[in-house]
């Protein structure tokens, strides 16, 4: 949902989510080739792949509302002011496992250094990212797998705290909601 004056993954949309008193605001992160984490839904900005670009190459990119592309640091700083809002941080899938692994380490360290572990929940379509999150957080964070290809028992066995599957997955496996609850998983 876009509110007037905001754009997907913008600081304005984060503030508007808090004003609306919703549970949380979901946002997407990508890491540049030089290790800077930016908040952006797509893997590209124009024709430039974020994971292959340096931050310098993309830092002046504008969102639809005119805001400059936010870094994760800036987004977390804004989110920290909004104490009643959960930050639902989606780490985007990358074809390169090493890039995913480094992104997880960088992101978890930043969240921890800012003291925002309780305000931040992680989601990803990448099984590797979720597995790395369990290792990096010691299982102390909310980690939701969203790809839809694991049963609740499999997700629980990997240390995830929840599943956040498309409704079509639950249409195919209606028993999974009850199974997830029996396993102690959260379902979104």
Language-model features, listed with the residues they occupy:
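Phosphate-group recognition and catalysis centered on beta-loop-alpha active-site segments
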Residues: 1-188
């Amino acid at each position: 949902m876009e509110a007037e004056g905001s754009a997907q993954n913008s600081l304005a949309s984060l503030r508007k989510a808090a004003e609306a008193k919703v549970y949380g605001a979901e946002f997407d992160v990508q890491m540049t080739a030089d290790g800077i984490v930016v908040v952006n839904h797509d893997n590209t900005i124009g024709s430039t792949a974020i994971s292959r670009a340096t931050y310098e190459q993309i830092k002046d990119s504008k969102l639809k509302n005119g805001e400059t592309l936010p870094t994760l640091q800036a987004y977390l700083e804004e989110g920290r002011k909004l104490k009643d809002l959960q930050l639902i941080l989606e780490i985007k899938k990358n074809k390169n496992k090493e890039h995913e692994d480094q992104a997880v380490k960088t992101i978890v360290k930043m969240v921890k250094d800012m003291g925002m572990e309780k305000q931040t929940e992680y989601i990803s379509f990448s099984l590797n990212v979720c597995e790395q999150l369990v290792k990096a957080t010691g299982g102390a964070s909310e980690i939701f797998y969203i790809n839809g290809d694991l049963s609740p028992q499999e997700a629980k066995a990997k240390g995830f705290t929840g599943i956040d599957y498309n409704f079509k997955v639950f249409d195919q496996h209606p028993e999974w909601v009850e199974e997830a609850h029996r396993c102690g998983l959260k379902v979104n």
